Curated annotation (Swiss-Prot):
It comes from Ignicoccus hospitalis (strain KIN4/I / DSM 18386 / JCM 14125). This is Digeranylgeranylglyceryl phosphate synthase. GO terms for biological process: glycerophospholipid biosynthetic process. PANTHER family: CHLOROPHYLL SYNTHASE, CHLOROPHYLL SYNTHASE, CHLOROPLASTIC. One of its GO terms (cellular component) is plasma membrane. It is an enzyme of class 2 (transferase).
């Protein structure tokens, strides 16, 4: 294989396009505390390394299922060897915590926790269904916590991290909804592989209804959390757009004659919703001083 083709295969293996969301999550977490600095940059690189390693080790352990669900993936298609993927994954999972230590011991330990979680999710938790969904949801939502933790630890004010918990829960719920929908999308291969997703255990329709409820709860929590973190109209506009897009997409899939085939649409819609939520945090922090300066930053002091 040509060098360029090999590079593309590696980038596909680590889901390079998804790493943008990881970096945005860390930066948004820092922005929640009102400051994006060098700690956020280091934490972004650390989180991206852990996420990339998690994606790679997932493909390594998931190769038999991917032969059914996604035969075009790098390992089942033969573009990346299984042992290559394993070594790359372990290197990235080790690199993340080492980078985190450059910020501080808590940030390094938190990166290590996520690295271990991603490894064992791929190795065994994934087949447990809901526990695996919860692990992925925690890992995704933790990017915001990672950003706020790194910023707070760098400033020597770790307790400030508690202010970000409501928004982290919002992301957690939307990610959990997406994972439930992903179980519907992968229903055929998961059933053959013995993966106990909600869709396999309770049926695709039940899983979609559960995802709809989780997405509703996530949107409601955004409205409750916004005033607690001094997030204003820009944030709410982005979150509302993403939330309504997700709800409409899941509802349309429920009305479909074949929910398994259409499940990719709400799964993508929820990914867009989470991206819009992160962008909403950043945009809100940028426009706040101009359009509604009376609203205090969550990490600032009253003046």
């Amino acid at each position: 294989m040509e060098a360029s083709g090999k590079l593309r295969a590696y980038l596909e293996l680590v889901r390079a396009h998804n790493l943008l969301g990881t970096v945005l999550g860390v930066i948004a977490g820092a922005a929640l505390l009102g400051e994006v600095n060098v700690a956020a940059a280091i934490a972004s690189a650390s989180a991206a390394a852990v996420a990339a390693g998690g994606y790679a080790i997932n493909d390594y352990f998931d190769v038999e299922i991917d032969k059914v669900n996604k035969p075009e993936r790098p390992i089942p298609s033969g573009r990346v060897g299984a042992e290559e993927a394993r070594k790359l994954a372990l290197a990235l999972l080790a690199l993340g915590p080492l980078l985190g230590l450059a910020v501080g011991p808590l940030t390094g330990a938190y990166a290590a926790l996520n690295a271990v979680l991603m490894y064992y999710y791929s190795k065994s938790l994934k087949k447990t269904g809901l526990p695996g969904n919860l692990a992925v949801s925690f890992s995704t939502a933790s990017t915001l916590l990672y950003g706020s933790l790194a910023t707070a630890e760098w400033a020597g004010e770790v307790a400030r991290v508690l202010r970000t918990i409501p928004i982290i829960l919002m992301v957690f719920l939307m990610t959990l909804a997406r994972e439930v929908v992903k179980g519907v999308e992968d229903y055929v291969g998961d059933k053959e592989g013995g993966v106990k997703t909600l869709a396999v255990v309770k049926g695709p329709d039940f899983a979609l209804r559960a995802a709809l409820a989780l997405a509703c709860a996530s949107l409601a929590l955004a409205y409750l959390a916004a005033p607690l973190l001094s997030l204003g109209y820009a944030f709410l506009a982005f979150v509302t757009l993403g939330g309504l897009l997700s709800l409409a997409s899941v509802a349309a899939c429920l009305r479909s004659e074949d929910p398994v085939r259409c499940a990719a649409k709400p799964r993508r819609a929820m990914k867009v919703a989470m991206f819009l939520g992160l962008i909403g945090i950043l945009v809100d922090r940028l426009v706040q001083p101009v359009f509604y300066p009376h609203v205090l930053h969550a990490g600032g002091e009253e003046g």
